[in-house]
Amino acid sequence: MYADAVTDPTRMAAGIRRRVMAHVLANNGGYLSQACSSAELLACLYASVLKLAPCDGPMHPAAFEAVPGPGAPRVSGGVFHGEPGPELDRLIVSPAHYALVVYAALIEAGRLDESALDQFNKDGSTVEMIGAEHSPGFETTTGSLAQALSTAGGIALGRRLRHETGRTFVFMSDGEFQEGQTWEAVQALAFYRLDTVRAVVDVNRAQCDGPMDTVMTIEPLATKLKAFGASVDSVDGHDVAALTDALERPTGRPHFVLAYTDPTRGVPIMNARRPVLHYLRFTDSKERAEYQKFYEEVLLVGSTS
């Protein structure tokens, strides 16, 4: 592990929020609520749970030279997880709009150079706003939401046929359970008893069109998943000990950790924006100044305490 990598999940989660907030301030907007809700989830994965190949130091992202095709250079965002191995874990990120949060987590973990965020969403950069298979931390393009769980199932089945023992983790959002492909994937995972698949779900109950329960309710989610043959743990998504225990618990079945989270966690001034939290774009200079003050007086102070 790189010497400057953060190894404590609680510290890493705070660093993720701080980096995303700084980026949002510098760019007049961003997916801040996703960082608030998922910081502990990604921190637990990268700091405690995932068994990845060691990293000699933070890497710079490759340039985007051409769309995938014959003769085009192949760039995989999975290189930031180190060399794959039969006993090592894989992580498939499903909600590609969480890309900024994933980049922040990789920086905290010492796997991505912090200057990478200077390339965010720029022409010719792989550090995209919506992550793709060439973006840091993304092994696959998960495109429309709900595709990654199926992809992870195929990866896990292939690994079983190769007698590999490593696990395949999936980071998901709760809105994906409004889509049929997710449930087809759960059914297949259970049928093939792919117990090396472990999904952690950011249940922040918020989506692009507003609160989940005003669009399409998904509860009782745990009951539904169990009926499909999966094992389930429901936990406080900001409790790193509970998250780690749930992610590591062997069950003999595909396992889902439903992490119930708060999309304003760590940045309570966002509550004034409820119920619309999906993407933060400052409405005027006054609002931006309020967030700047919070960043300087709370988030930055907390990083030095």
Language-model features: where?
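Conserved thiamine diphosphate
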Residues: 164, 213-246, 300-302
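A short, conserved beta-to-alpha structural element at the edge of catalytic cores
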Residues: 192-217, 221, 234
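Short acidic, glycine/serine/threonine-rich loops at helix termini
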Residues: 103-105, 132, 181-183, 209-213, ...
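Cofactor-binding active-site loop characterized by glycine-rich and histidine/acidic residues
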Residues: 20, 36-191
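Glycine/aspartate-rich loop-and-adjacent alpha/beta segment that forms the canonical ThDP
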Residues: 66, 224, 240-305
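N-terminal capping segment at the start of a domain
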Residues: 13-29, 202-204
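Generic beta-sheet signal
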Residues: 89-91, 166-170, 197, 252-261
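A short alpha/beta connector and helix-capping loop motif
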Residues: 179-204, 254-260
